[in-house]
Amino acid sequence: METSRIAIAALALSASGLVYIAQREGYSEQAYPDPVHGTKVPTAGFGTTGPDVKMGTTLPPVRALVRLRADASEKEVALKRCIGDVLLYPREWDAFVALGYNTGTAPVCLNNERSGPSTIVRRLQAGDHKGACDAILLYDRAGPVIKPQDRCSHPDNRTCRGVWADRQRLRAMCLGEPTP
């Protein structure tokens, strides 16, 4: 039986949420070019980016785990600020933090087309938790979408099917369903 939802201010990414991110991102001791942005966004460890990560940077396993936790904590702070005072299950929080870790928090917080809060934020603030979890599936791209086939959810897309599979797993996690 699931416990009650908890105030977002009291939530922290769970150990299983952190392990999920680590497994999804994979580990690389040597910095590599980001799959979407190339060498403009060098990535090392468990998906770590930032001004201190350059091509040639090495991040040994222990440092990479410490950095993963610190990076995830930064995402949590940003998400708490944009989502506001809502109640969530820990599994919902884990899913939104994992999404923000992968996409960056700006897309999870804001809708640039509407100049306002994202669908996830609007639905959470309205108390529509299922709708907010379903909205994870809206993050179905890696890079710009020029034509429908560019969406990772499109059956003809062969370049980012892993992104779509991840979004389906995050939605299931958020809803407390078995992960596909």
Language-model features, listed with the residues they occupy:
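Active-site nucleophile-His-acid catalytic modules used for acyl/amide transfer and hydrolysis
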Residues: E74-S115
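Small-residue-enriched, tightly packed secondary-structure blocks
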Residues: T39-F46, P61, K75, W93, ...
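Alpha-helical scaffolds flanking conserved acidic
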Residues: L11-L18, L88-V97, G131
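Long, amphipathic alpha-helical surface segments
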Residues: M1-A9, S16-T39, D52-V53, L59-A70, ...
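Solvent-exposed coil/turn segments that connect beta secondary-structure elements
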Residues: G47-T49, Y101
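Flexible, active-site-adjacent loop/turn segments at secondary-structure boundaries
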Residues: Q30, P42-A44, V86, L99, ...
